[in-house]
Amino acid sequence: MADIDDTTSAETTFLHAIDQAIDRFVSAQLPSFEPLGDDVVGFFHAAAAFVTGGKRLRASFVRAGWLGASGESAAPVMVDTAAAIELLQGSALVHDDLMDDSDTRRGRPSVHRDFEGRHRDAGRVGDAEWFGRSTAVLMGDLLLSWSNELIVDAAARVETTAGRRAVTLYDRCKSEVAAGQFLDVVAQTRPDVSVDDAMLVARYKSAKYTVERPLQIGAALAGGDDALLDGLSAVALHLGVAFQLRDDVLGVFGDPEITGKPAGDDLREGKRTVLVGRALELVGPSERSGLLAALGTDDGVAAARDLIRASGALEAIEADIADLEAEADAAIDRLDQQAQAVLRPLALRATRRAR
């Protein structure tokens, strides 16, 4: 792949349209819930604020699928569908932060920590941590409900078969991300990790959810045929795993000022990632025991990072990413020129990023 390019003006306009679509949707929701009082209104505003910003990669893949199938510019129905996928992403992130007990997200307090702090600041009675955790569960559910509502409305505005197909893919995506997240939870209960097991988590938690389904949903909404959806899938599964491997690297070696999360957070949380699995394959018995003992501890982050670096796992993962990029590039070559034009720069954004 060529060097990464800046986001195009058309893409920037599209990303701004996503924010506007979410704002419109939330504003339309509020009048029905304002009678419930300021607490609920504040909860809704906090949910909307949580999905502001971010990489918007999933929305961009919806756009790429749409453009690859239709060649049309950012139609409102596509923008609303992409916004729905971003709301789904918001739901997953709120719950993910809660399960990982993460303190921050994008440089701000995670939802459960935010509302834990609000509980204390307001002088409420009861357990502040319980309040924060409970609110995070509910906010994730709320964002999922909003996502469902928005995509069903968008699908009703296109040809019936196309709309039904897009919603079916969306429903499958929700089940796949739940399955991938559960596999991730199970992995953290095991004393060891294999690269194959970690790759399975990467495929379901990231490749399908981040790249494959958004691409296919956008293409299906525009009336794309089976051949196009299959071609997009071939691109996505290579590209999506590369995206997750880059995430693994950033979770250990990323700059907190850029990622918005503390350095080594994946190690602190005991994540059984492909990077960790690769390191365990490469080190000797004593280093292996040391790395496994360090995972999931605050004090062991620096030692675990040093062991991973010394093992050669970082170089091995970078080589894996390069191989996956090449395979994705070859799959893009098999698409028509219209699809190639929108996918190539987006593929670079997914794998050559610092956050």
Predicted regions and their residues:
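Conserved N-terminal diphosphate/IPP-binding helix and adjacent helical/loop segment
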Residues: 1-85, 90, 94-95, 99-129, ...
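Residue-level signal for inorganic ion chemistry
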Residues: 61, 147, 180, 276, ...
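Acidic, Mg2+-coordinating active-site segments of isoprenoid diphosphate-utilizing enzymes
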Residues: 67-69, 94-124, 148, 177-195, ...
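Alpha-helical scaffolds flanking conserved acidic
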Residues: 72-88, 133, 163-169, 228-239, ...
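A glycine/threonine-rich phosphate-anchoring loop and its flanking beta-alpha core
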Residues: 123, 127-156
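A short glycine-threonine-serine/GTX helix/turn-capping micro-motif
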Residues: 132-138, 196-206
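Transmembrane helix-loop-helix
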Residues: 151-168, 291
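Short hairpin/turn module used for nucleic-acid contact or packing/dimerization
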Residues: 303-355
